C-alpha cells in the first residue's frame, strides 16, 4: 500500500488515520538527543517509491519540539528527489511557543514544495476552543477540492456558531494569547520543577504546546507499596491514576515507550495538587 512517514513521538491518532485511509504508517523513532525531531538522514532512510506523505507536527504533541527553518529546509532537500511525496504540516500549536522561539511553517521554509504541502491549523489549542471543533487547511487546489468533496458527504460543514466564534477569536488574538501564553509558561516551569525534584523522572524543556514528555525509564521495574511491579510505562500511568487520581498518558501511546506525557493546561490549583501527588507517589516506589 501507499506509505505515510510518521516521526515518533507522534500524536496518537496519526497512525490510525493513515490505516483508516488504507495507507501504511511508517513510524520513524526520533530521540531526545536530536530534540525529538526527524533528521534528514532518518527521512532519507524511510523514503521508498511507495511513500506518499510525510507528517510533520510543529510545535509537536507530546514533546513540544519546534522545527527550525534550517531543519525544515534540510528535510525539503531530501524530498526534492521524491516528487510523489506530499507533506502535511500540522501547525495546530503554532502560537503556543516559549522563550521567543521563532516559528516557520514548512511551506515558508520550502517554497519550492508549496504545491506538495498541506498546512493544517485551527483554534482548538491556541484559543482553548477544543469543543468548537473547527480547523482549517491550505494546500494545492486539487487537494483542497478533494477534501471539500469528502467533507460535504460526511460532516457537511462546520457549525455556523463555531465559525463566528473562531472569527472573533482570530481577530482578537493578541491580548488573549499574551495572557494565555504567560499562564502556560508558569505552569510549564512548575511541571519541569517537579520533574527535576523527583528521583526517577527527567525531561527536556518543551519549546511549545502545553505538555512535558518525561522520561520514566528509571521507574520501570520498581515496586509499589502494595507489592505490584511496574513493568512498563503503561503500568506506571495506570498506577498513578489509581493511586493518586492524576491522569497522565504513557509514552507507548505516542510510539515512544518509557515516557509519560504530562499536560499542564489545567487550573493552577489542580496542577499544584497533581505535581505534589506525582512526586509523593514516585517517592514511594522501591
Q: What spans do the regions from the language model cover?
A:
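PLP-dependent class I/II
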Residues: 1-286
Amino acid at each position: 500500500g501507499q506509505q505515510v512517514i510518521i516521526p515518533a513521538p507522534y500524536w496518537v491518532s496519526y497512525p490510525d488515520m493513515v490505516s483508516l485511509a488504507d495507507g501504511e504508517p511508517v513510524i520513524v523513532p526520533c530521540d531526545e538527543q536530536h530534540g525529538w525531531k526527524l533528521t534528514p538522514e532518518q527521512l532519507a532512510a524511510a523514503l521508498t517509491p511507495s511513500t506518499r506523505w510525510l507528517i510533520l507536527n510543529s510545535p509537536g504533541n507530546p514533546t513540544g519540539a519546534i522545527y527550525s527553518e534550517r531543519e525544515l529546509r534540510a528535510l525539503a532537500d531530501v524530498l526534492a528527489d521524491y516528487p510523489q511525496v506530499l507533506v502535511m504540516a500540522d501547525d495546530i500549536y503554532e502560537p503556543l511557543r516559549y522563550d521567543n522561539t521563532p516559528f516557520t511553517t514548512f511551506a515558508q521554509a520550502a517554497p519550492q514544495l508549496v504545491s506538495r504541502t498541506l498546512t493544517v491549523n485551527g483554534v482548538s489549542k491556541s484559543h482553548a476552543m477544543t469543543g468548537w471543533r473547527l480547523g482549517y487547511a491550505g494546500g494545492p487546489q486539487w487537494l483542497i477540492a478533494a477534501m471539500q468533496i469528502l467533507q460535504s458527504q460526511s460532516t457537511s460543514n462546520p457549525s455556523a456558531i463555531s465559525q463566528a466564534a473562531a472569527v472573533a477569536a482570530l481577530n482578537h488574538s493578541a491580548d488573549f494569547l499574551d495572557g494565555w501564553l504567560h499562564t502556560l509558561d508558569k505552569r510549564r516551569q512548575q511541571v519541569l520543577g517537579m520533574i527535576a525534584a523527583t528521583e526517577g523522572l527527567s525531561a527536556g524543556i518543551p519549546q511549545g504546546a502545553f505538555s512535558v514528555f518525561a522520561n520514566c525509564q528509571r521507574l520501570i521495574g520498581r515496586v509499589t507499596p502494595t507489592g505490584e511491579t511496574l513493568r512498563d510505562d503503561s503500568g506506571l500511568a495506570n498506577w498513578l491514576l489509581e493511586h493518586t487520581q492524576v491522569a497522565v498518558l504513557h509514552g507507548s501511546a505516542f510510539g515512544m515507550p518509557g515516557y509519560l506525557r504530562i499536560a499542564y493546561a489545567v487550573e493552577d490549583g489542580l496542577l499544584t495538587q497533581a505535581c505534589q501527588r506525582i512526586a509523593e507517589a514516585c517517592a514511594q516506589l522501591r
